[in-house]
């Protein structure tokens, strides 16, 4: 008989402060080595140039990835004016000579303000967007023609925080899928001197912030002391914006079989958000009429995520440790 896969020994989330020069895959590989298992996913990659928040989900928590779709992101970013690059960041090839720009704070603030709101953004050709099944950057490296369709994005905050020489720094909150590189390139085009992204730190993904993030070296030190699990955000603490209900053992059995179940008003507890400093402003606790629910046992173990089919009747859509 084929060997059955062993369950992951740890379930929960890690917030890593990714260093510059490392790929997101490098960090995932490092955590897999420290944890001793491969069941690890993430909530969005970072380019090697970028530093900051990389959220990893481990074990059973990987089944929650879809519920984080659309979480807003926050960044601090430095735009270097004077020339554009083919990748829109400092790792690309300069497109023209480096001119000494004369930057006007008022103009930059106006252009940033004009980009707040929803709009269509064309991704950089040096991106992982697929073209006929292949990443666009593969085609761009071969100097093949790359045509990418604009995608809807939204910028919620785009605030100038400082200027020094040819560099301007910003605080940005945006929808998932927004390219900060493109914001830098577009501003340079509008000013007429060219610009590219010189530095960037992701400071938040939804409710996860840089305040919570640890260096990979910190995690390695904890693992050497046998305290890897102590650095996890527990499975039961994830998706805190969703309401919860603790069910009795007889109902727990039904839930773990995947059957519909009813919840009384008295059982429902609204979502409870205690956002760390720097988290995005998007999330609000959801009440009794929320379309989804976290289901807990009497021992406060998360056993399922369920979806409302009619008021106060729910269908499990993710079941942890299901019964046959």
Cite the ranges covered by each PLM segment:
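Accessory RNA 3′-end/elbow-binding domains used by RNA modification enzymes
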Residues: 1-42, 46, 50, 106, ...
């Amino acid at each position: 008989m084929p060997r059955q896969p062993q369950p992951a020994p740890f379930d929960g989330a890690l917030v890593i402060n990714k260093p510059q020069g490392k790929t997101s895959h490098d960090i995932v590989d490092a955590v897999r080595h420290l944890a001793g298992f491969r069941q690890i996913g993430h909530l969005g990659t970072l380019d090697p140039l970028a530093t900051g928040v990389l959220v990893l989900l481990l074990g059973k928590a990987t089944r929650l990835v879809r519920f984080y779709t659309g979480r807003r992101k926050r960044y601090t970013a430095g735009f270097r004016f004077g020339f554009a690059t083919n990748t829109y960041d400092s790792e690309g090839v300069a497109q023209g000579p480096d001119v000494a720009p004369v930057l006007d704070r008022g103009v930059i603030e106006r252009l940033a303000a004009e980009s707040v709101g929803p709009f269509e953004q064309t991704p950089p050709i040096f991106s992982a967007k697929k073209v006929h099944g292949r990443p666009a950057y593969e085609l761009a490296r071969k100097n093949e023609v790359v045509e990418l369709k604009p995608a809807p994005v939204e910028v919620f905050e785009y605030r100038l925080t400082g200027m020094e020489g040819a560099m301007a720094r910003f605080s940005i909150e945006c929808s998932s899928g927004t390219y900060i590189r493109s914001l830098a390139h577009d501003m340079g085009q509008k000013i007429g001197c060219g610009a590219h992204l010189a530095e960037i730190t992701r400071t938040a993904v939804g409710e996860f912030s840089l305040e919570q993030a640890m260096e990979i070296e910190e995690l390695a030190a904890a693992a050497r002391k046998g305290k890897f699990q102590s650095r996890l955000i527990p499975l039961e603490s994830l998706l805190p914006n969703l309401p919860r209900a603790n069910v009795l053992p007889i109902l727990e059995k039904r839930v773990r079989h995947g059957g519909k179940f009813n919840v009384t008003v008295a059982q429902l507890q609204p979502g409870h958000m205690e956002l760390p400093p720097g988290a995005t402003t998007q999330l609000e606790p959801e009440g009794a009429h929320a379309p989804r629910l976290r289901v807990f046992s009497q021992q406060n173990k998360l056993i399922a995520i369920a979806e409302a089919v009619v008021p106060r009747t729910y269908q499990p859509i993710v079941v942890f440790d299901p019964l046959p």
